[in-house]
């Protein structure tokens, strides 16, 4: 618009000119047109140039300099559009339908040739433009002493020419050309990476060395290492020079951003492939430092050498065309190392490292489930992930991805509760290294906790995992004999020690450093859990949180401990004492008081048993069929402090019954006025059964022993008679007898009455090696326990509230779980008051539903109709 306005103004001047002046302008204008065409077409000589300059002088004399500029630039544009641009794009027409993997090596030659041709044409047009600029500058210098304005003329015209050139090419740009550039830089950078990594050096040495170097190498004047190093350097320089020439030519035609985007995307693609190659599926080795070293060795050295070749380090970002590159850098003494990194190289380094961190982070997050399964062997991968997240701050991506993996791979019906718990503990340990405060661990663990709360065996599995000797790992790793509880207590102690040191053993300088490193809690943090800097991950607390309260865990442990103690054949309780002491530290002495009393019962039982046996050694001799007290070992329980014990009637054989009576009498003598009340169905009995052809040993329950001992006097029994003698129901007898039948000791046959079966002792066992030395732990084999389970105890305790619940549902029709819970707490305040948790109530109501007393629909409980 500025040029057009200037032309209008100059045309008004023509009205004031004489006829001779107008005639001179007309002749000069015609000559100017003719000489412009000759110059641009390349058909002119020095005489034409002199004539052209004289015509420019004449037109400028009459104020028509803007006409000169506009017409010449428009003529250049038309010529370039018909010739240079069209010819340039024709080189790439053959690749419009090809995919990048079908380009082949010839595309490199085609690209270089096309750029060389268009650069030559551009240089010629610039030469023509320089003639115009020189003519305009000469006229202004003669008419004015303002040298600065004449320099501005040159900058202005060349800037307009460059814009015209770039816009002409961009408006005719084929869609596949950026892809061709990307492919070219990708191939060249892969070749460069192979050189820097030492691959393919031998093949390239002959091409890289000049004749003198080849002769020196052949004659032995150059050693092998020097030759390889020289070959690598020359190969690098040659490749960078070729790439630099392409980039320089692209810049010269206005494709600065396109070129930089092409080789930048190629660099990032190569870096991504390198990260994938180094990381792989090996989680036991840290790869972050190797990736950073590769970035320094290949991409940054290439960029430093490239920008130095392009002259950016000298001109500080100004190209020959006057455009500034955003990748400009300062000079470097050598391509092999950056002594003083420029601002451009520093920016590139930050970009590449961030991309590497993000790529490695995404790889590790995608495989986080496998990494945690292999923890702690996969600790290096966890440490890499931690550093990546600290750099990128994308913790939320980890949370979302890992929760999705958990729901798809772990929280399924096919996964056992034990496996889920072990994975949960490993998750806590691994993520604690990434997030010591546990902010993101809370979000990751929530789906696992919600899922486990819906499984009936969760409490039992947690207690078993805490107290067994596998170290809390599914594969049994860890210190032999160590329980997960011991491991967690050691971890907690180490965390507390670290915190203690931080709080009380820091000087003022360190305190200032700690204060300067303080960061606010992330937005995901729960403010109710305290500040991040004062919070630590409590694994045991997280396990307890699954259950709902520590009382439930302690009750389950009491049941499990009671079962273990009752099944012991000796008084070795060191492991149990150690576990109780650890639980006391975490849950308090009051919670574990009953467990301590149970252990003290075992200790007292051992002492009492020893005293009774000592007293029996001075007694009278044994009569026939009489059993010695030495064969009996008792466990004396303080019943009020033990969980409810399963009791069933059992009539023992006479000698055994007398032995128990004698033992009780001697206990009464020692512990007057206390008396023993035998639980005859509990305990274990060691038997040796002697047959005609062999002897067999078993360790069985008292009921099993009572059954087989009845066959000592009588070889055959009916089920009814045997049940009456032993004093147990027939259905209970059926379950126990199956054991002896399966061992080949008893045989079942049809009696005289077809409706009754007879059990007969097998005197001779044909399969002599079948069952020798076999033992039985009846509680585990038959699914029976000596102690009532927590569920059974809860059902018994909750029975008194069943009528209240039925009455509420009769009055209100249907009620939600929370409403039933709150109503019971409000009205059941008399002894016994309602003190159950929401989970316990839900478990009891589920039992009523299974008994078809209630229905559960749409989250509401109602009476079964």
From Swiss-Prot:
Domain of life where this protein originates: Eukaryota
PROSITE patterns, sorted: CULLIN_2 (PS50069)
A GO term, aspect molecular function: ubiquitin protein ligase binding
Localization terms from the record: Nucleus
Pfam families per UniProt: ANAPC2, Cullin
Phenotype caused by lack of the gene: Gametophytic lethal phenotype.
Quaternary structure (record): The APC/C is composed of at least 10 subunits. Interacts with APC8, APC11, CDC27A and CDC27B.
Function: Component of the anaphase promoting complex/cyclosome (APC/C), a cell cycle-regulated E3 ubiquitin-protein ligase complex that controls progression through mitosis and the G1 phase of the cell cycle. The APC/C complex controls several key steps in the cell cycle by mediating ubiquitination and subsequent degradation of target proteins such as cyclins. The APC/C complex is required for the female gametophyte development and is involved in several aspect of development by controlling cell division and cell elongation. Involved in the control of endoreduplication.
Name listed for the protein in its UniProt record: Anaphase-promoting complex subunit 2
Annotated organism of origin: Arabidopsis thaliana
């Amino acid at each position: 618009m500025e040029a057009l306005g200037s032309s209008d103004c100059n045309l008004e001047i023509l009205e004031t000119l004489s006829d001779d002046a107008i005639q001179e302008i007309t002749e000069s204008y015609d000559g100017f047109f003719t000489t412009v065409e000759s110059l641009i077409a390349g058909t002119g000589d020095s005489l034409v140039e002199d004539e052209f300059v004289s015509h420019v002088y004449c037109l400028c004399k009459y104020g028509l300099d803007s006409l000169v500029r506009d017409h010449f630039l428009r003529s250049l544009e038309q010529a370039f559009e018909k010739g240079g641009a069209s010819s340039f794009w024709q080189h790439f027409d053959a690749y419009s339908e090809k995919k990048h993997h079908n380009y082949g090596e010839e595309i490199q030659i085609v690209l270089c040739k096309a750029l060389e041709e268009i650069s030559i044409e551009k240089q010629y047009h610039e030469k023509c433009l320089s003639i115009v600029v020189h003519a305009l500058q000469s006229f202004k210098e003669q008419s004015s002493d303002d040298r600065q304005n004449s320099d501005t003329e040159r900058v202005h015209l060349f800037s307009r020419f460059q814009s015209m050139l770039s816009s002409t090419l961009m408006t005719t740009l084929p869609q596949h050309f950026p892809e061709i550039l990307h492919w070219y830089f990708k191939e060249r950078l892969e070749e460069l990476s192979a050189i820097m990594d030492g691959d393919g050096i031998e093949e390239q040495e002959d091409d890289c060395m000049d004749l003198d170097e080849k002769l020196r190498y052949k004659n032995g004047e150059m050693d092998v290492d020097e030759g390889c190093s020289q070959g690598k350097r020359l190969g690098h320089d040659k490749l960078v020079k070729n790439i630099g020439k392409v980039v320089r030519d692209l810049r010269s035609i206005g494709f600065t951003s396109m070129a930089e985007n092409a080789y930048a995307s190629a660099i990032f693609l190569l870096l991504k492939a390198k990260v994938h190659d180094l990381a792989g599926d090996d989680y036991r080795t840290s790869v972050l430092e190797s990736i950073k070293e590769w970035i320094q060795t290949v991409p940054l050295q290439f960029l430093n050498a490239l920008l130095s070749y392009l002259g950016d380090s000298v001109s500080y970002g100004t190209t020959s065309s006057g455009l500034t590159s955003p990748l400009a850098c300062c000079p470097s003494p050598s391509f092999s190392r950056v002594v003083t990194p420029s601002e451009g190289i520093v920016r590139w380094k930050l970009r590449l490292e961030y991309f590497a961190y993000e790529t490695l982070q995404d790889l590790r997050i995608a495989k986080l489930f496998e990494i945690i399964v292999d923890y702690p062997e996969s600790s290096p991968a966890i440490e890499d992930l931690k550093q990546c997240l600290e750099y990128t701050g994308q913790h939320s991506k980890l949370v979302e991805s890992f929760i999705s993996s958990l729901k798809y791979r772990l929280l399924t019906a096919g996964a056992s509760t034990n496996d889920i718990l072990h994975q949960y503990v490993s998750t806590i340990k691994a993520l604690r290294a990434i997030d010591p405060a546990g902010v993101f661990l809370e979000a990751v663990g929530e789906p696992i906790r919600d899922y486990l709360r819906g499984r009936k065996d969760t409490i039992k599995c947690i207690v078993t995992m805490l107290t067994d000797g596998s170290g809390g790992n599914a594969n049994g790793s860890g210190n032999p004999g160590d329980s997960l509880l011991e491991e967690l207590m050691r971890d907690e102690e180490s965390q507390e020690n670290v915190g203690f040191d931080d709080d009380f053993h820091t000087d003022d300088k360190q305190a200032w450093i700690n204060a300067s490193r303080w960061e606010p809690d992330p937005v995901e943090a729960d403010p109710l859990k305290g500040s991040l800097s004062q919070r630590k991950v409590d694994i045991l607390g997280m396990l307890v949180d699954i259950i709902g309260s520590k009382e439930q865990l302690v009750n389950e442990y009491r049941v499990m401990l009671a079962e273990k103690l009752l099944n012991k054949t000796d008084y070795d309780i060191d492991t149990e004492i150690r576990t109780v002491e650890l639980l006391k530290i975490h849950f308090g002495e009051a919670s574990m008081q009953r467990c301590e009393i149970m252990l003290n019962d075992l200790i007292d039982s051992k002492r009492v048993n020893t005293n009774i046996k000592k007293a029996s050694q001075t007694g009278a001799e044994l009569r026939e069929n009489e059993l010695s007290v030495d064969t009996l070992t008792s466990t004396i329980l303080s019943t009020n402090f033990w969980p409810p014990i399963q009791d069933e009637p059992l009539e023992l054989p006479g000698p055994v019954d007398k032995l128990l009576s004698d033992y009780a009498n001697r206990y009464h003598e020692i512990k007057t006025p206390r008396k023993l009340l035998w639980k005859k169905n509990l305990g274990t009995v060691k038997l040796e059964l002697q047959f005609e052809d062999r002897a067999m040993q078993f360790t069985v329950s008292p009921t099993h022993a009572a059954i087989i001992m009845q066959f000592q006097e009588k070889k055959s029994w009916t089920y009814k008679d045997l049940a009456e003698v032993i004093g147990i129901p027939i259905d209970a007898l059926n379950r126990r007898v199956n054991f002896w039948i399966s061992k080949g000791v008893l045989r079942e046959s049809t009696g005289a009455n077809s409706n009754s079966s007879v059990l007969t002792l097998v005197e001779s066992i044909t399969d002599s090696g079948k069952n020798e030395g076999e033992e039985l732990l009846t509680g585990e084999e038959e699914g029976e326990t000596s102690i009532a389970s927590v569920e059974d105890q809860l059902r018994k305790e909750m029975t008194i509230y069943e009528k209240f619940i039925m009455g509420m549902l009769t009055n209100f029709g249907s009620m939600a779980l929370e409403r039933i819970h709150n109503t019971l707490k409000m009205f059941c305040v008399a002894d016994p008051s309602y003190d159950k948790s929401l989970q316990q109530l839900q478990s009891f109501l589920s039992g009523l539903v299974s008994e078809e007393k209630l229905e559960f629909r749409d989250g509401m409980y109602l009476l079964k109709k």
